[in-house]
């Protein structure tokens, strides 16, 4: 009679356990999944719409899953999609009526929430969670909001004792823009700039002042740019001031504004008193 080896008795139980585990993981392919978000920050423009996309790492369906987008903490809900429909009960007041779900590719594990009419206050971190039964995974997204400000306006006045004063104003920027004054030779001109933030919109307005010397009054350029946007996208905003003070009491402001590839020209007259 052949003797049974002690280890042989455990082989059937090991085989059964292995088959059971295989059945658990291969039933619908979703028992162990990973959610991915964009690898880089997303850029959104104030007043426009922006999607926050997330997807499963494997090409498997997210149908039947609960999909949730929130801000810094789970209770700060941006949008929830559950049981095939949008759920608004938990949504933050700030996002009421401003979000929509894009599930056109949910069958292949992709979904997105669109934020409509982006504001400065949408800037920051987001999280998306895909949940099925007790399994869930989440990804983090970063949204950078940029505000394109208005074309700069230049006003020139004669301050009597301090000579000519040029003011460059603009509003609607985010974050704080960069302001640069140049003379006609392309040399920088020292300026005093002030920024203010609107409590209601979070957008930045600016007032930049120069008191040009005689060598600079032939012309000035005030340039304003957004640090988040390339020149070719935001446009280069400039206003050129030409002042004639050689014994005359009047002059012309020639204003040229270049924005998004277009040139706008206007002129107006002003009076200065020349000693």
From Swiss-Prot:
Residues 30-140 form the Ig-like V-type domain. Disulfide bonds join 54-128. Keywords: Disulfide bond, Glycoprotein, Immunoglobulin domain, Membrane, Signal, Transmembrane, Transmembrane helix. Gene3D superfamilies: Immunoglobulins. It is found in: Membrane. The chain crosses the membrane at residues 195-211. Residues 1-29 form the signal peptide. This is Butyrophilin-like protein 10. It comes from Mus musculus (Mouse).
């Amino acid at each position: 009679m052949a003797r049974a080896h002690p280890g042989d008795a455990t082989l059937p139980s090991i085989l059964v356990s292995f088959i059971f585990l295989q059945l658990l993981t291969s039933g619908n392919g979703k028992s162990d999944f990973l959610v991915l978000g964009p690898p880089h920050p997303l850029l959104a423009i104030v007043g426009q719409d922006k999607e926050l996309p997330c997807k499963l790492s494997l090409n498997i369906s997210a149908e039947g899953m609960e999909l949730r987008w929130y801000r810094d903490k789970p209770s700060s809900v941006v949008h929830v999609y559950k049981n095939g429909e949008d759920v608004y009960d938990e949504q933050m007041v700030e996002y009421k009526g401003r979000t929509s779900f894009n599930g056109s590719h949910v069958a292949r594990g992709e979904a997105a929430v669109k934020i409509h009419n982006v504001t400065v206050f949408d800037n920051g971190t987001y999280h998306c969670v895909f949940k099925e039964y007790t399994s869930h995974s989440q990804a983090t997204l970063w949204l950078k909001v940029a505000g394109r400000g208005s074309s700069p306006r230049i006003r020139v006045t004669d301050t009597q004792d301090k000579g000519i004063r040029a003011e460059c104003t603009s509003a609607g920027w985010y974050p704080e823009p960069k302001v640069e004054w140049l003379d006609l030779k392309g040399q920088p001109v020292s300026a005093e700039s002030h920024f203010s933030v609107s409590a209601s919109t979070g957008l930045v307005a600016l007032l930049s002042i120069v008191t040009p010397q005689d060598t600079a009054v032939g012309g000035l350029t005030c340039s304003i740019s957004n640090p988040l946007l390339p020149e070719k996208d935001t446009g280069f905003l400039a206003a050129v001031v030409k002042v004639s003070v050689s014994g005359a009491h009047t002059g012309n402001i020639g204003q040229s504004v270049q924005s998004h590839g277009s040139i706008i020209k206007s002129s107006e007259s002003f009076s200065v008193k020349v000693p």
